């Protein structure tokens, strides 16, 4: 309790550095969780590797079931940089394998930071690098609201501008399709798709649904659709 109180007071007083000593494992996680609960601010938790980050992510998800606990690590399952071997005069091209689920979780982390205040992002130290201008990313968000006026062509253009691809056959992550007056969009950061019904250029309904079964889950008065990638720039 003393450590929790002192750490919380230090944060409220804008202390630049604080160190927690004498606690290991889950005890340290619990202590920091109580500090987060006391301070009530968005929090970034950094670990030194992916394995520990995954463990911390699971622990914080259990400790904060109603918060936006997010996971932000490198999405590469495998990465080989460009290289040159002078002995054999061989140039090796860059090669990599990207994990789609990790990419989804990374985008979900940044979208949560723009939507909510109760955010805890668990990351690895290797992810401390720039992702571009957050203001530019935020400006590209598409806001869909019931009874708002929008044409099919305008919504299509907005979606393409934020790197969603049209695919009228298969609805996959980062894709959308158009079925008459209905847009079905699979956000890059969600596990559910949304169905937007537009009639006479007016949004009639916004519904979340399972992209595999088509089962509808919840209706929305409004929905914020975030870009399908982090590196994004102004059209100008």
PLM features: residue spans?
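ASCE RecA-like P-loop NTPase motor cores
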Residues: 1-236
């Amino acid at each position: 309790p003393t450590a929790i109180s002192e750490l919380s007071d230090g944060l409220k007083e804008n202390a630049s550095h604080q160190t927690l000593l004498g606690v290991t494992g889950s005890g340290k996680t619990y202590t920091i969780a109580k500090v987060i609960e006391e301070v009530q601010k968005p929090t970034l938790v950094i670990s030194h590797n992916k394995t520990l980050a995954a463990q911390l992510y699971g622990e914080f998800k259990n400790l904060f079931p109603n918060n936006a606990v997010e996971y932000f690590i490198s999405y590469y399952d495998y990465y080989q940089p460009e290289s040159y071997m002078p002995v054999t005069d061989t140039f090796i091209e860059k090669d990599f394998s990207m994990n789609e689920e990790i990419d989804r979780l990374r985008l979900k982390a940044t979208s949560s930071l723009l939507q909510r205040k109760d955010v805890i992002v668990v990351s690895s130290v290797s992810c401390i690098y720039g992702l571009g201008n957050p203001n530019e990313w935020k400006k590209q968000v598409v806001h869909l609201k019931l009874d708002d006026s929008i044409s099919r062509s305008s919504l299509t253009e907005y979606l393409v501008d934020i790197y969603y691809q049209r695919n009228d056959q298969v609805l996959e992550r980062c894709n959308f399709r158009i079925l008459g007056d209905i847009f079905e969009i699979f956000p890059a950061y969600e596990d559910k798709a949304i169905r937007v019904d537009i009639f006479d250029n007016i949004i009639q309904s916004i519904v979340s649904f399972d992209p595999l079964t088509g089962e509808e889950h919840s209706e929305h008065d409004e929905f914020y659709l975030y870009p399908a990638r982090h590196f994004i720039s102004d059209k100008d």
